[in-house]
């Protein structure tokens, strides 16, 4: 091998071994802790070595809520995001705070509870453990995020609204733990509105049965006008915008919601079809002819 090729190989190996800078690491990277006193604890959490976790906290006196230098998240939060069930349980048993949140000046300001609900990776068992050890079922982000225009805006997503997207089981755990079913924030929809956005009619029916306010108003934006004014609508209007193939699972679940509301005095079948929905139906359902279109309009 020539000296030139040998030098190239050495440089390649060295560059391959170079770890990314902390500022380039994502929030689920245990190496965030590498150059901190909690590195051994972090490795034990990653490996789910509960004996070593206990040793690091009880004998080496490493704070169970030690925060990483970038996101200021605790190891409980990191263990939650990476679905380390045994580590989560051990950290909680050692006193880790399930309601501690990460940096709220640069990042979302979310707790382990909210992370467990926002991501699909963490299992329902992890959320159950967090709630068992005092996690707030109404956990709400208190940080910031970047919107579509590149502006920094408040982040106020909360556990129940987030769980609608990730897991029915997590929704049930939160409700059983006392979550406010009608909770909403300045930047996050109430849970039943998220159900309609994400097509989770099954979860919507469950929340309605548990006491969700079906007479509340929802805010819509009139995109056909230049100043995009807002206006209020009822739940029937919102349901009219939920378009599913007739006979599909989502359609059948929607009809259960429709029947529930009918028993409460709200007749979906007498509600007008919002303007613009005919075009949506043509695009999403693609009826073959006018007869199919008319049938769908009558039954959707």
Residue ranges and their predicted role:
Residues 2-9:
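Sec-dependent signal peptide recognition
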Residues 13-16:
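C-terminal motif of bacterial Sec signal peptides marking the signal peptidase cleavage site
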Residues 18-20:
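Bacterial signal peptide processing site
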Residues 31-43, 66-77, 101-118, 140-162, ...:
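Ankyrin-repeat boundary/"N-cap" motif
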Residues 48, 83, 120-122, 166-167, ...:
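Ankyrin-repeat intra-repeat helix-capping/turn positions
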Residues 52, 86-87, 122-126, 169-170, ...:
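Conserved ankyrin/ankyrin-like repeat signature
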Residues 55-63, 89-98, 128-137, 172-181, ...:
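Ankyrin repeat domain, specifically the short helix-to-loop turn at the C-terminus of the second helix
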Residues 245-300:
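Terminal, low-structured helical/coil segments at or just beyond the last alpha-helical repeat
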């Amino acid at each position: 091998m020539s000296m030139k090729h040998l030098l190239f190989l050495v440089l390649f190996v060295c560059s391959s071994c170079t770890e990314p800078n902390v500022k380039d690491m994502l929030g689920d990277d245990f190496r965030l802790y590498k150059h901190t006193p909690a590195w051994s604890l972090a490795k034990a959490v990653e490996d789910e070595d509960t004996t070593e976790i206990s040793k690091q906290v009880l004998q080496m006196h490493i704070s169970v809520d030690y925060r990483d230098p970038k996101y200021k998240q605790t190891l409980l939060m990191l263990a939650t995001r990476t679905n380390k069930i045994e580590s989560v349980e051990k950290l909680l048993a050692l006193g880790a705070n399930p309601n501690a949140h990460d940096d709220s000046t640069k990042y979302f300001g979310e707790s382990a509870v909210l992370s467990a609900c926002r991501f699909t990776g963490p299992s329902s068992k992890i959320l159950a453990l967090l709630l068992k050890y005092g996690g707030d079922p109404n956990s709400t982000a208190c940080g910031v995020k970047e919107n579509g225009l590149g502006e920094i805006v408040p982040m106020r997503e909360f556990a129940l609204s987030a769980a609608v997207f990730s897991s029915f089981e997590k929704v049930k755990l939160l409700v059983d733990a006392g979550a406010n079913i009608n909770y909403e924030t300045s930047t996050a929809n109430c849970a039943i509105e998220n159900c309609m956005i994400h097509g989770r009619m099954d979860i919507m029916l469950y929340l309605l049965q548990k006491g969700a306010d079906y007479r509340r108003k929802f805010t819509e934006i009139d995109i056909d006008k230049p100043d995009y004014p807002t206006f209020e609508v009822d739940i029937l209007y919102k349901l009219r915008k939920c378009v599913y193939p007739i006979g599909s699972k989502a359609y059948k679940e929607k009809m259960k919601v429709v029947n529930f509301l009918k028993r409460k005095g709200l007749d979906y079948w007498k509600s007008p079809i919002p303007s613009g929905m005919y075009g949506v139906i043509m695009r999403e359902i693609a009826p073959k002819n006018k007869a199919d279109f008319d049938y769908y309009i009558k039954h959707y």
